[in-house]
């Protein structure tokens, strides 16, 4: 009987290894196109670019000056914590830079008047109010694959109701439907987002797990897929009510970057959300300017470059709002001092110890997976 042919590949040796690799690469390039496989050192792509959040503190916490382009971002937190406000500010910044934005309003709760106050060009904003979760994610996928969208916001994951649940009876069990829907959609969208350079912001809600004895009982809706596919996850919480006398005028809000694949994680940003006005960029510029020695504070007086800005933080905030050129100048100095965005040193960023850079870390809140 003839010997059975051995179908196992034999390891190449010596010069044959390079020849075998070159032949395989040539075949892959022929079948799948140029660039299907490349050496990492030959990749001449620029550093990850970002869409500004519109707030200096958030841009600093994200590490690259904003939300990364071509990636998935999850913004979650309790009700009325400022999640949609953060996303709308990012849309406004993308539009100011000449980009096109889309908003998938699964909650059917978008307020156009409030969006306009935050700087969103509502006439140019693409809005969809889908009937089902499948329809919402299919529309989002088609917009991303067009290659024309710079940022797309899905508000919210919890409202992406599967078609079977909508058509079913009240009380019917639909275990895992939404999780499977999200998992399939994210598998499809991830590559398209990277190729088109579109930033996708998924707004999510919190739920509580029953029977948890240790650790946080809080979890997000939609299964685990979004946790894995997201390059950045932001936990947004309201920590204080801002008052003018007895009247509430806004909220002090904390954003914690609990996962970050493009910069060291666990950084925290605190900022003010003023009612009817949105996130106060000027307030964050004052806070970071003082922290980094760019703005000098003596008692209640604030001084910049030898000139007095005013007495009291609120007066200085209003002054910076009336002089945006000065606010831009101070913000640029903050980014330069902290090496954020275009001022980042890419080589140093890979060797920095994130624990040394971020005070008061609570590793029990979230993992970085």
From Swiss-Prot:
Main location group: cytoplasm
Record's keyword annotation contains Cell inner membrane: no
Binding, ATP: 77-84
Entry's transmembrane regions: none
UniProt cross-references to SUPFAM superfamilies, sorted A to Z: P-loop containing nucleoside triphosphate hydrolases (SSF52540), RecA protein, C-terminal domain (SSF54752)
Keywords: ATP-binding, Cytoplasm, DNA damage, DNA recombination, DNA repair, DNA-binding, Nucleotide-binding, SOS response
Xref: CDD domains: RecA
Gene Ontology CC terms, in alphabetical order: cytosol
Subcellular location: Cytoplasm
Keyword DNA damage: yes
Functional summary from the UniProt entry: Can catalyze the hydrolysis of ATP in the presence of single-stranded DNA, the ATP-dependent uptake of single-stranded DNA by duplex DNA, and the ATP-dependent hybridization of homologous single-stranded DNAs. It interacts with LexA causing its activation and leading to its autocatalytic cleavage.
Family: Belongs to the RecA family.
Protein name per Swiss-Prot or TrEMBL: Protein RecA
Organism: Corynebacterium pseudotuberculosis (strain C231)
Classification lineage: Bacteria, Bacillati, Actinomycetota, Actinomycetes, Mycobacteriales
Gene: recA
């Amino acid at each position: 009987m003839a010997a059975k042919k051995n179908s196992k590949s034999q390891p190449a040796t010596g010069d044959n290894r390079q020849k075998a690799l070159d032949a395989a690469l040539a075949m892959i390039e022929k079948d799948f196109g140029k660039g299907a496989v490349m050496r990492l050192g030959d990749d001449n792509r620029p550093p990850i670019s970002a869409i500004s959040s519109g707030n200096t503190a958030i841009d600093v916490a994200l590490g690259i000056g904003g939300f990364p382009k071509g990636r998935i971002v999850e913004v979650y937190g309790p009700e009325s914590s400022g999640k949609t406000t953060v996303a709308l500010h990012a849309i406004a910044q993308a539009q100011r830079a000449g980009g096109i934005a889309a908003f998938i309003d699964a909650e059917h709760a978008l307020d156009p008047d409030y969006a306009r106050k935050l700087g969103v060009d509502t006439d140019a904003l693409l809005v969809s109010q889908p009937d089902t979760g499948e329809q919402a994610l299919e529309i989002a996928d088609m917009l991303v694959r067009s290659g024309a969208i710079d940022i797309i916001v899905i508000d919210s994951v919890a409202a992406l109701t599967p078609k079977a649940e909508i058509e079913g009876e009240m009380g019917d069990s639909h275990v895992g439907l939404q999780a499977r829907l999200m998992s399939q959609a994210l598998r499809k969208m991830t590559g398209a987002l990277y190729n088109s350079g579109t930033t996708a912001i998924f707004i999510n809600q919190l739920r509580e797990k029953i029977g948890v004895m240790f650790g946080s009982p809080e979890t997000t809706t939609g299964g685990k897929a979004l946790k894995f596919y997201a390059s950045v996850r932001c936990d947004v919480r309201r920590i204080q009510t801002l008052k003018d006398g007895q009247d509430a005028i806004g909220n002090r809000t904390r954003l914690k970057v609990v996962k970050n694949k493009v910069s060291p994680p666990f950084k925290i940003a605190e900022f003010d959300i003023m009612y009817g006005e949105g996130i106060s960029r000027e307030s964050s510029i004052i806070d970071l300017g003082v922290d980094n020695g760019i703005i000098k504070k003596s008692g209640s007086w604030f001084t910049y470059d030898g000139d007095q800005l005013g007495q009291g933080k609120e007066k200085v905030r209003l002054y910076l709002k009336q002089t945006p050129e000065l606010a831009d100048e101070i913000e640029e100095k903050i980014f330069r001092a902290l090496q954020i965005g275009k001022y980042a040193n890419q080589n140093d960023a890979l060797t920095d110890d994130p624990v040394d850079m971020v005070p008061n870390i609570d590793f029990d809140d979230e993992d970085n997976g």
